[in-house]
């Protein structure tokens, strides 16, 4: 039996999230397992690094599965992609040791939230970005973001339906990058709570719109009451772009994406 890790990219627009649900509900996991099972000629179950909600995209999702099928890595990629719908792609495949676990071996995660800040809505990328039609004060948003970096209780920034045992997370960095009319919020943490990035984005956008001062982000954090924060930002602009693992697993290093952004962003 061989354990295999895959890098997965998907457009979450037409999915009800990552996780397998009842029959007839379209999820990324369901599509991926069906495709891999055809290649393996046996039933395949995948374990992902992090589940994403309906409408959320992934460029750096990582999964693992076990198989005794005698397939080369390129066969998993080519065969899998042949059997996958057009909105899911296998980016890479590598054999890993039995102690590798897509979720529990991860040391950090990185998300990007992409905002199109323009008076007119986009026609081509309407499901890949969040449109904000009024100017945003990026300097104020950066100041607000600075209050959230570090080890904190993020109760006020998680969904009321979040089932995580602890609201304590370490936000390593929270950066804002301007690419013309596109604003990219990049969050890097040991792990994230349900809706955490989207709730952070909602607060920062409210600050950027001048409706709240930057220190309000800190006030929301310290109140530990979700009801006192901003509305949860839409899922369309959110991307899971990277899962970081110890170097000993030697997983491929790919551009974070989405692919229409430069490989390297500068503040």
Curated annotation (Swiss-Prot):
The gene is truA. Gene3D superfamilies: Pseudouridine synthase I, catalytic domain, C-terminal subdomain, Pseudouridine synthase I, catalytic domain, N-terminal subdomain. Formation of pseudouridine at positions 38, 39 and 40 in the anticodon stem and loop of transfer RNAs. The keyword Zinc does not apply. Its EC number is 5.4.99.12. GO terms for biological process: tRNA pseudouridine synthesis. One of its GO terms (molecular function) is RNA binding. This is tRNA pseudouridine synthase A. Homodimer. It catalyses: uridine(38/39/40) in tRNA = pseudouridine(38/39/40) in tRNA. The active site is at 53 (nucleophile). The lineage of its organism: Bacteria, Pseudomonadati, Pseudomonadota, Gammaproteobacteria, Oceanospirillales. Belongs to the tRNA pseudouridine synthase TruA family. Keywords: Isomerase, tRNA processing. The keyword Ligase does not apply. Substrate binds at residue 111. Pfam families: PseudoU_synth_1 (PF01416).
């Amino acid at each position: 039996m061989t354990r295999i890790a895959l890098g997965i990219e998907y457009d979450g627009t037409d999915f009800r999230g990552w996780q397998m649900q009842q029959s007839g509900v379209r999820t990324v996991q369901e599509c991926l397992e069906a495709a891999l099972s055809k290649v393996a000629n046996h039933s395949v179950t995948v374990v992902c690094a992090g589940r994403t909600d309906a409408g959320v995209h992934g460029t750096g999702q990582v999964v693992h599965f076990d198989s005794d099928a005698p397939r080369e890595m390129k066969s998993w990629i080519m065969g899998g992609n042949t059997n996958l719908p057009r909105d899911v792609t296998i980016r890479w495949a590598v054999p890993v040791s039995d102690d590798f676990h897509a979720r529990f071996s991860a040391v950090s995660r990185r998300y990007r939230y992409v905002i199109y800040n323009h008076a007119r809505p986009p026609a081509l990328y309407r499901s890949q970005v969040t449109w904000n039609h009024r100017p945003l004060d990026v300097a104020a948003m950066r100041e607000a973001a600075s209050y959230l970096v570090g080890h904190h209780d993020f109760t006020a920034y998680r969904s009321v339906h979040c089932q995580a045992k602890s609201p304590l997370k370490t936000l390593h960095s929270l950066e804002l990058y301007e690419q013309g009319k596109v604003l990219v919020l990049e969050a890097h943490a040991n792990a994230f709570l349900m809706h955490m990035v989207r709730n952070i984005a909602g607060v920062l956008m409210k600050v950027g719109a001048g409706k709240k001062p930057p220190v309000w982000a800190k006030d929301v954090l310290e109140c530990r009451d979700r009801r006192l924060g901003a509305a949860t930002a839409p899922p369309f602009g959110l991307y899971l772009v990277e899962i970081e693992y110890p170097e000993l697993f030697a997983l491929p290093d790919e551009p974070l994406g989405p692919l229409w952004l430069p490989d390297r962003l500068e503040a």
